[in-house]
Design a protein with these regions (language model features):
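A gly/proline- and charged-residue-enriched helix-loop-helix capping module
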Residues: 7-50
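Active-site loop segments of alpha/beta catalytic cores
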Residues: 33-272
Length: 272
């Protein structure tokens, strides 16, 4: 299903023209993605790379880390961001149907990768989540076979819900988390959060997300609340404000920002 973007000239902002305008009429028309893999093309690419630099750096097939099991990005593309918010009031049962469908579609997506043997390990120096490395001795599972494809339970999972930053923690707990949890159950370890200020909705994340290890601390998070709630039990994945180097460079301000994080969370698992 295509979700055309309607763009304006100012700052590159845009909105979607959602394909689903009427839930009762349109939702039953959408279907899961049809997935395929080009194995001959992949093998040809590997052979070409091996011919060029294989004596220096043997090429290998490595799957990328997908974005994201958060669901609300795709839900917003289907029904529109405003409607995603408004249906929580105007048509809660309809929104539950939307979220159930999107969750099921994502389950279809990840299970296909597993069935086709396309998953690869992410427990080394690979990027996982919204920032951080996958280094861990908890993955893969003890029954993983050396040299074989990874399973979902052998790799990191990741979810977030940046699009719903403006809703209440209660609505987040009702409409979002229950549809993320079945997906997160499939993975060996999990990361949660990206640029949303998670301190406002951290309780249901800690309560329901299984095997959680890494929690995002965005530039807009209250670090003291975050640290108090996660203690030493999870990695505090801190994202300093990028505008400090993108639009200006004030070394004192940058140092002060990092110093504040170290003072608040430096005594526990922390990555910046």
């Amino acid at each position: 299903v295509e979700s055309p973007q309607i763009r304006v000239e100012q700052k590159g902002s845009y909105v979607w023209d959602p394909p689903i305008k009427d839930l009762a009429r349109d939702l039953d028309k959408v279907r899961y993605r049809e997935l395929s893999v080009d194995r001959p093309g992949t093998e040809a690419l590997i052979q070409r790379a091996d011919e060029v630099f294989g004596d220096l750096l043997p090429p290998r097939i490595q799957g990328s880390f997908w974005w994201t099991m958060g669901l609300t990005w795709e839900a917003a593309k289907l029904i529109g961001l405003e409607q995603l918010m408004m249906y929580m009031y105007d048509d809660p049962e309809g929104l539950h149907r939307v979220m159930e469908w999107v969750s099921g579609e994502h389950m279809h997506f990840i299970k296909w990768f597993e069935t086709e043997g396309l998953l690869t390990r992410k427990d080394g120096a690979q990027s996982v989540g919204s920032g951080g490395l996958g280094c861990t001795d908890e993955l893969p599972q003890p029954d993983w076979h050396e040299g074989g494809p990874a399973r979902l339970i052998d790799i990191w999972g990741f979810a977030e819900s940046q699009e719903t930053t403006g809703i209440s923690p209660a609505m987040f707990e009702e409409f979002i988390v229950p549809y993320q949890v079945p997906l997160m159950e499939e993975f060996g370890l999990n990361c949660y959060g990206c640029c949303e200020p998670l301190h406002q909705r951290l309780d249901p994340v800690l309560r329901y997300i299984p095997r959680l290890r890494r929690i995002s601390g965005s530039p807009w998070v209250d670090q003291e609340i975050m640290k108090r709630k996660i203690g030493h039990d999870f990695i505090f994945s801190r994202k300093p404000n990028p505008t400090q180097i993108c639009t200006m460079f004030n070394e004192n301000q940058i140092r002060a920002d990092v110093r504040q994080t170290l003072e608040i969370a430096g005594d526990g698992p922390l990555e910046i």
